[in-house]
Amino acid sequence: MVVRARHTVPDVERDWPGFVDMPPVLATAMMIGFIEQTCIQALRPFLSEHQRTVGTHVDVSHVAATPVGMRVTAKVELIDVHGRSLVFRVACFDEGGLIGEGNHQRAIIDLARFTQKVAEKAAKASADSAG
């Protein structure tokens, strides 16, 4: 991934004013999203068409700033499997070296079942707020 302005701290979320005047470097949230995307893509060939994975835990340090225009790479290694739970060792690098590392956990889900549960949760919340 090449860091663009939209990946920087000031552009993460304009509704959160604390970010607006921060330096324009790769946002931690974007680095985590890139790690998740890399894990998703690494797992895709091993899942059925009815399965996906969802992030369940992130323990990653962001140790160096990356300016706009630099290329970032993510390396992920599946280090543990417990049933549907998958644990990855992850690291991100820019052209200057290591920028982040840690562990990321994902869970394998059945897409239809998961989507149904989310719809039920949304319907209940809507009914509760209306009542």
Model-derived segments and spans:
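Catalytic strand-loop segment that frames the active site of acyl-thioester-processing enzymes
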Residues: 1-26
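Short beta-strand edge segments in extracellular beta-sheet folds
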Residues: 2-4, 93, 105-109
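Short, well-structured hydrophobic secondary-structure segments
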Residues: 26-46
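Short capping/connector residues at structural and topological boundaries
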Residues: 30-31, 52, 65, 104, ...
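Hydrophobic beta-strand-centered segment that forms part of the acyl-chain substrate-binding groove
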Residues: 39-73
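Hydrophobic beta-sheet segments that form the core/acyl-binding groove
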Residues: 60-95
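C-terminal output/interaction extensions
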Residues: 105-131
